[in-house]
Amino acid sequence: MNLLTDIKNQIRDYVIETTYATPEKIKDETSLFKEGVFDSMGFIMLINYIESAFEIKAKDTELLEDNFESINSIAGFVYSKINN
């Protein structure tokens, strides 16, 4: 596997474990907020998890829906932070 795939898998596992959503509900492109998977508190917990698990720091200006809307967008954000 490659790094981006590994990141996606780790994030998906976290989302499923913490929200009790079924794996069938959490696809790479599923809108996690529009589908009600995460609320504002879940978002804060997600940020804390990402910063801890991937040893990155998200700037306030990066906390945009576009960066955290789906597994794909979260993984892309994490991947870009790791490679900077």
What do these predicted regions represent?
Residues 18-37, 56-64, 82:
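Phosphopantetheine carrier-protein modules
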Residues 62-73:
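AMP-binding/adenylate-forming catalytic domain of the ANL superfamily
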Residues 47:
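Short-chain dehydrogenase/reductase
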Residues 1-24, 76-84:
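Thiotemplate assembly-line natural product biosynthesis machinery
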Residues 44:
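Conserved catalytic core of two-component sensor histidine kinases
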Residues 40:
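Catalytic nucleophile serine of serine hydrolases
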